[in-house]
């Protein structure tokens, strides 16, 4: 993964040791079949589903059941606290969780499920706001860099930074989460947006957060921007962040429920 790449590119002694520890940690997680971090996060799913997919009506219930099973089988840390009542459900499900974001595709019978484990540290830098139109793309840049200099240290860098640009806080926030579903190293299809991804990546790297915020050449693994058209009088912008272990999965089902997982090559879902 990208941590191995950053390890090879780093030259200073301390960050090299930290990267070596990270890669050893990942190797142990695989060999021992254990989570790579004690904070296994809140389970979130982004579902791109065709209207003719046979399990579309049951899908949210199945995902909730899968989270409960994984909580005890893996095991996963209990990370679902009911707000206002302030008790832990101890099953990783509760009111509105796991969160399922939907993209409905008409006249299609496939289903793509992105899974994401949103840890506490990497969630902390998340923020959304609406800028005056005169702030322009410089305002977007300032917003992102301010969040990274203020909170990036606590988010277990190097980070994957998702940026959403739209009209309002909720549309920008959803896009910034969707940006984290894209692979590291991918680029926005809009040439100007792709240029901004690179400029932001270079700018955040120049902060020098390094692995675990201890200093180094790299602060991020990449910056992914997702965007929509906006109202001419507003610029909605949001940031979401993934930590160095960036626990993301992607499974594709056809109408016969044959499955392919392109993020984890050792998993055979059809066995």
Feature locations, PLM:
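Short, small-residue-biased leader/transition segments that mark boundaries at the very start
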Residues: 1-4
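Translation machinery proteins
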Residues: 8-34, 89-94
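Mid-sequence acidic-hydrophobic segments that form the walls
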Residues: 25, 66-77, 118, 147-151
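A generic, well-ordered mixed alpha/beta core segment in the N-terminal half of proteins
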Residues: 41-106
